[in-house]
Amino acid sequence: MPKLNDVVAEIAADLAKATERGAVATYIPMLAEVPINQFGMAVVTADGETILAGDADTVFSIQSISKVFTLTLALGQIGDALWTRVGKEPSGNAFNSIVQLEYEHGIPRNPFINAGAIVVADAMLSGHQPREALGAILRFVRFVAADESITIDEAVARSEKETGFRNTALANYMRSFGVLRHPVDHALGVYFHQCAIAMSCRHLARAGRYLAFSGRLTPEGPSVVASERARRIAALMLTCGHYDGSGDFAFRVGLPGKSGVGGGILAIAPGKASIAVWSPGLDPHGNSLLGSIALERLAKAMRWSVFAG
């Protein structure tokens, strides 16, 4: 088995020379301004080692990766009642598609497409004002990442609100079916702000530890969330975490993962490591092009695929 340090360093060195980097997201103006020639990677292992490469300490907008953290909190808050309002199946459609909602009476296919994440944000509002729900999300992210400096980028949140017409349509459509139970602007306010959380690869890899270690931040540490909840979230990351590219990611990488259009991916090697990669150029499905390549190479070199014999 090769040394993890060497594998990570080699991947970062090779991808620094890549000529094909995908395209940055342009429908959110603030994301369109991010320089494409960046790549970062961080791995936190079961023994507590942190391995960094490239732009691992550069903060970026985590976007849909935030859906992992809000799902964790919503399940803790309302439990399995959440699954009466959002499904657990891959969608096969674009992450912001409205088509499926019409056929399925306003219930989104899973909590990682935009419509599903808006339902999760709405669930976070049960008994709370939007500011309180956002405070709970930010506190949890800071806690699992062990870094109080993590913040919400208000400029990105404003940019999303000003251009989020498709998400507004999704929310209003679900509200018409009674799937959303709070004012649309409240649910969207939480959603836009959670997506604007700014983190680095180092932050993200640390934050994902509870998913890698059965609900704990270290294999022998105290439980942060129930092990069953962590396992179920990881299962959804494997089947639904990369939009309509989820099957391809599972085929090539074989790890639970959640991507965001900011170019980040959080991936989990159960019992072994939490991994974060970032490169802002996206493939046609909205997933980081170089990030996916990096994770494929890492999983293959370390035999970390959940399907490895």
Swiss-Prot record:
It catalyses: L-glutamine + H2O = L-glutamate + NH4(+). Keywords: Hydrolase. GO terms for biological process: glutamate biosynthetic process; glutamine catabolic process. Substrate binds at S64, N114, E160, N167, Y191, Y243, V261. It comes from the Bacteria. The keyword Hydrolase applies. GO terms for molecular function: glutaminase activity. Its EC number is 3.5.1.2. HAMAP family: Glutaminase (MF_00313). Homotetramer. Belongs to the glutaminase family. This is Glutaminase. It comes from Azorhizobium caulinodans (strain ATCC 43989 / DSM 5975 / JCM 20966 / LMG 6465 / NBRC 14845 / NCIMB 13405 / ORS 571). The lineage of its organism: Bacteria, Pseudomonadati, Pseudomonadota, Alphaproteobacteria, Hyphomicrobiales. The gene is glsA.
